Amino acid sequence: SVGFKAGVKEYKLTYYTPEYETKDTDILAAFRVSPQPGVPPEEAGAAVAAESSTGTWTTVWTDGLTSLDRYKGRCYHIDPVPGEEDQYICYVAYPLDLFEEGSVTNMFTSIVGNVFGFKALRALRLEDLRIPPAYVKTFQGPPHGIQVERDKLNKYGRPLLGCTIKPKLGLSAKNYGRAVYECLRGGLDFTKDDENVNSQPFMRWRDRFLFCAEAIYKSQAETGEIKGHYLNATAGNXEEMIKRAVFARELGVPIVMHDYLTGGFTANTSLASYCRDNGLLLHIHRAMHAVIDRQKNHGIHFRVLAKALRMSGGDHIHSGTVVGKLEGERNITLGFVDLLRDDYIEKDRSRGIFFTQDWVSLPGVLPVASGGIHVWHMRALVEIFGDDSVLQFGGGTLGHPWGNAPGAVANRVSLEACVQARNEGRDLAREGNEIVREACKWSPELAAACEVWKEIKFEFKEVDTLD
């Protein structure tokens, strides 16, 4: 007779191991599992562990040719989610040998590849990952990181200011460059290509790069400050993307940009590597993230996508505002902002952090607050995000009644006033509006901005909430 018993067997017999002690080298995952009616949580959790590691739906004779005990994922703990019927957090440990070194692509293919279409589950969400130091060390991470960026730009002790050029589509390269110049001349540190701006018929990429470089050099000469424009190198194939980054380097500009989810992790890691070797900073936009992270019970939480970006490489990444028009509940947002910036982050479920994460000196990423923010939000942004952040006002700069440069002036004055007040020990949460009003006396540009945006609010209930 054959040396194994054929047929379908329950996953939990092999893959549910509550007695397992996790290793320091394991990758740990926290999944929010919603089983189909009648499927016990142990079976559902074990199924997730199996299908995202060594398992298949039946016993196969080739199982005997390897050591399942060495390579299988294990569901080692299950917690019911409070307030939800039949929903569980299942913790899974994966042996490090299952993953290719330095490949975010392979890590995701394994952990979230097949299992999300699994019939025994109604829904599945990856809430958090613990990346062990042994695996972190196989990644180069951000091209430069927060400290090196500050040194390159010679800007310290305050958040950096940006602005997305609008209208995002339709401007000619010359007019686009003019808008860039006005914003930088007015006092911003950076301007930004919109994520949709690649190389369209109305503005080919090379023309845009040239006019933006001219704007950067002119504004630098006039202000004595280092300026940058995020030139979007995202393209239809990776060779073209690198070609655009090479051209940016030849122009001598400080920073390029990439849409890391639509472009893909493989392309992103290649670009990050090029940027490191050639002294370019890399700004990352998260277009498409909400498709993946918006549903509470299915998909991947953004904190996982943020960790993945830090491994793949990027110096800035968009991370919500807490205020403004885009999603972000304060504690949760600050949780993944710290995961981006800090070297060591303690487990803290009140901030949505399921595991203690040690980045072992991988460079940090600057979070970018962008989307529906204006001068009245400045006090909150400075208080929430602190100095290591980029605050991006698109409409909040270009929508100024007097034009782009005065819009930039208003934002810079508002920022400097808030930072100075904070440094003097004043309470931004309580006195913030007063601080901005005082600054209006010295800046007619700020006064005009405060008047325009005094009534605007985006009031909707948060979607991304804690249990």
UniProtKB/Swiss-Prot annotation:
The record marks 325 as: Transition state stabilizer. One of its GO terms (cellular component) is chloroplast. It is found in: Plastid, Chloroplast. CDD domains: RuBisCO_large_I. It is an enzyme of class 4 (lyase). Its EC number is 4.1.1.39. Binds 1 Mg(2+) ion per subunit. HAMAP family: RuBisCO_L_type1. This is Ribulose bisphosphate carboxylase large chain. It comes from Eriodictyon californicum (California yerba santa).
